[in-house]
Every structure is written in C-alpha cells, then in structure tokens.
C-alpha cells in the first residue's frame, strides 16, 4: 500500500491533537477523583440540664460503671475549684480531665470536661470503699433482697506525701458531731516549725479543721471528717485522714452506722462492664506508690480483666482497642472510656457526651454558698502540703504626744463651772463579748487531720 508522504504530517498532527484531548480528559477525570469529599459539619450539641452524680442504682450482676460523662462551659470568673464543688467533683479530677487549661483562669466560654462517670473499684460492694488513686469514696448501703444495688460517691481528700492514708480494711468505731480537735504532737511540731503554731485544743467552730462531723476508725490516729477548708477536698492535703466536703459528710453521717466496714484500695487502673462495652478509667500513679503497675495494653488487660468479662466481650462480638488502651494508660485523664466499642476515640466520646448548663444540678448536696474565700497562695499551699506561716498581727498604732499650748488667763466667760477632764474609754473584746460554751463535742484519740 502506498502512502503519500505529504499526508504524514497531517496524520501526525491529528494524532497529536487526539492524544492531547485524551490527556486533558484524563487530567479532568483525575482531578475529580482527587477532590476530597467535604465531611458535613457536625451539629452543635444540645445543651441540657446538669445531672446530680452522687447517688445511683445499678445491677451489680451486669454493671460496674455508674454515672454519665458531662461537658460544660466556663462562665464569668469561674475557677476549677468553683466548678468542682458545683458538680461534686474534686479539684484534681478536673485538672486531670482537662489538661492544658489554666485551673485559675480557664477562660469564659471554654468547654470543660466533667468526669462524672465512674468505674467502680475492684472490691466487694460493701460499706465504704475508698480508691486512693481515684481520690473518691463509694458507699454501698445495705438494701432489701431483690432491690437494685445503691452506691453513693463523693470526692475526698487524702494524706499528702509523707503522711499517706493506709490501705487495708477497718471499720467505723464512733461518730461525733461538732468535734473538738486535739492536734497530735507530730502535727503541732510540724506547724510550729513552719511558723504556724497550733493550740493544744481547738473547740468546735469555723476554725476547726475537722469540720462539723467526724468518724473514728479502727485504725488509731486516722479519721473520716469534714473540713473548714473545702478547697482542700479532691487532692492530697491531709495528715492521713479522709476529708469530705461539709455537705457530703453531713449527708453520709446519719446513714453510716457504727461498725460499717471500710475498705481502702489503691487502683490507678479500673476496668468495668457497662451495657455493651468494657470501660477503662485510668488515673496517675500516686507519687509515693512504689509498686510496678502494668504499662502496656496486653499487661493491663491480663491483670484487670476477669474470665467473666472476657466472656461478655466475646458474647458482644467485641474487640478491645489496644491502641486506645495504650493511649489512656500513657495519658491518664481519669475519664471512663469504652475500649471495646468500634470506632471510639477520646475526642469522639467527649463530643457525644452530655453537654450541660454550668449551674448547680437538681438534687445536689451543696447549697451553692461559699463558706470561705481563699487566695491562690493558700490554695497552692494546701495542694502541695506546705504550711504557710501565721500572718503577724497588726501592731497597735501609738499616738505621738501632743504638746499643749500654755493655758490662757481666765476671762469672765471661761471662769465659770470647770468641766471634768474627758475619761478615756477602753473596750476589752474578750470581756465584753460573752463566751458561749459548746457542748456535745468530744475529743478524738490523738487524731491527725
């Protein structure tokens, strides 16, 4: 076949144009494939009423998690201490759950996580169960046969480093309203050396660190009591005793009979089943806890999951997210998170939680009234276990003597009836104010606080 040489350039040109057209079409197709599909903007969460999270009923045969996670927004000049008390949380609970936020200046409008969902400690559901790592107490009152299990939970303050609260079992030995405090020699020595000497006896009243209610334990020198410094609850601030908010100890006082069993554990990692998933709640290891704790997901699951819980995981065709477990253990937020539910991340779980108004929940123990204003210096001293020296009493002002002008010669007007010299009045506060004796209080055995 003969092809004219003059037609070759024309054919080549046509082929080139055709190829160029295909190339353009291909680029357009490629660009369409590469375009990311914009995810729909999630709807803003519905703001609901806050929940009071201190008393729950649950089925102990199937559940080991109570409460519900909540998120609120900072209002006005709120600090973490204000928000914590409002929602029956401890200060450290809020700090852990909200890393990177200034607890004194969180910023108006900023979202704050309220860790108001709790995995119950691995201990018998009987009497008072205290988890030191959790800085929280769980009270299981006796219920009639066939009724659901009830648990009451509150934040607590525990012994600071060097004055740690012991672990083990004991019981309530006695109860006292409006107790008198006799500071033990060790505590008086510590305060004296810090420039804050204590009296040998502190009567009931606003200056009494035991607060208005006290329970003595089978352990000598250790107490459960209220406090005159509520901001110290939810942290390591005591000399080994267990501190409650005033409103919380007042509620529990009448409900807890003498002889109630007390179990104190120290569990930084707690696992529990709730509905369709296994939850993990991780807390920082206490500074003076020298034990070796599991650090990897495999070790955590091996140490914390019972055969019964494994059977539940299998029954729900669930799979534990090892990456999520490692994340929670490495960065313990103190938030109960489901680790056997597909597609869960901490951020997604927080977003899906209950967003609430920043106000006192219905049914809360606290009445919302502050008893004591505290400075940041006082607060941080309590948190770090430092005793501030007692402030010096203001010195009395001494008036400089005034030189009197020489007396003028009496005149007809002044030479009348002489007035008596003015009498200087003195006011003895101690004598002028009647002292009211307080009865009904009693001393505790060489207790700390």
What are these regions (language model features)?
Residues 2-16:
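Bacterial N-terminal signal peptides that target proteins for export
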Residues 58-62, 68, 116-132, 273-274:
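Intrinsically disordered, low-complexity Ser/Thr-rich linker and spacer segments
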Residues 36-37, 187-407, 419-423, 444, ...:
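Exported/periplasmic cell-wall-interacting domains
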Residues 30-31, 37, 75-105, 149:
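LysM (lysin motif) carbohydrate-binding repeats in extracellular/periplasmic proteins that recognize
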Residues 76, 92-100, 110-126, 152-159, ...:
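N-terminal post-signal-peptidase region of extra-cytosolic proteins
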Residues 23-26:
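C-terminal motif of bacterial Sec signal peptides marking the signal peptidase cleavage site
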Residues 77, 107-112, 259-262:
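Loop/turn positions that initiate beta-strands
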Residues 53-88:
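Primarily a LysM-type cell-wall glycan-binding module
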């Amino acid at each position: 076949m003969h092809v004219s040489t003059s037609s070759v350039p024309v054919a080549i040109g046509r082929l080139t144009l055709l190829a160029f057209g295909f190339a353009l079409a291909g680029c357009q197709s490629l660009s369409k494939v590469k375009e990311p599909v914009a995810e729909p903007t999630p709807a803003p969460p519905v703001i609901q009423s806050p929940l009071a999270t201190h008393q729950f009923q649950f089925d102990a045969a199937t559940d080991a998690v109570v409460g519900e996670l909540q998120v609120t927004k900072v209002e006005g000049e709120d600090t973490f201490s204000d928000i914590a008390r409002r929602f029956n949380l401890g200060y450290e609970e809020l700090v852990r759950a909200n890393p990177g936020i200034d607890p004194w200046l969180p910023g108006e409008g900023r979202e704050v996580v309220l860790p108001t969902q709790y995995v119950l400690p691995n201990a018998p559901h009987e009497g008072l169960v205290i988890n030191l790592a959790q800085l929280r107490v769980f009270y299981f009152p006796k219920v009639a046969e066939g009724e659901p299990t009830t648990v009451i939970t509150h934040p607590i303050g525990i012994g600071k480093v060097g004055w740690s609260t012991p672990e083990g079992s004991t019981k309530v030995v006695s109860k006292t309203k409006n107790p008198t405090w006799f500071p033990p020699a060790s505590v008086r020595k510590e305060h004296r050396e810090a420039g804050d000497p204590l009296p040998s006896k502190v009567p009931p009243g606003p200056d009494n660190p035991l607060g208005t209610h006290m329970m003595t334990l089978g352990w000598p020198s250790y107490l459960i009591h209220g406090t005159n410094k509520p901001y110290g609850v939810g942290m390591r601030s005591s000399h080994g005793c267990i501190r409650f908010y005033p409103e919380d100890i007042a509620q529990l006082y009448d409900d807890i009979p003498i002889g109630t069993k007390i179990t104190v554990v120290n569990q930084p990692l707690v696992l529990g089943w709730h509905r369709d998933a296994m939850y993990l709640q991780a807390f920082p290891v206490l500074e003076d806890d020298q034990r070796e704790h599991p650090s990897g997901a495999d070790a955590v699951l091996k140490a914390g999951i019972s055969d019964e819980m494994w059977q539940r995981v299998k029954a729900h065709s669930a799979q534990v997210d090892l990456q999520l477990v490692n994340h929670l253990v490495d960065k313990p937020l103190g938030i109960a998170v489901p680790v056997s539910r597909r597609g869960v991340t901490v951020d997604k779980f927080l977003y899906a939680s209950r967003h609430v108004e920043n106000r006192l929940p219905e049914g809360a123990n606290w009445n919302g009234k502050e008893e004591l204003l505290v400075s940041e210096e006082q607060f941080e001293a309590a948190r770090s276990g430092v005793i501030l020296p007692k402030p010096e009493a203001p010195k009395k002002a001494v008036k400089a003597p005034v030189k009197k002008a020489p007396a003028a010669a009496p005149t007809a007007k002044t030479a009348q009836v002489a007035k008596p010299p003015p009498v200087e009045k003195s006011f003895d506060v101690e004598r002028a104010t009647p002292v009211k004796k307080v009865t009904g209080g009693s001393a505790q055995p060489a207790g700390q606080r």
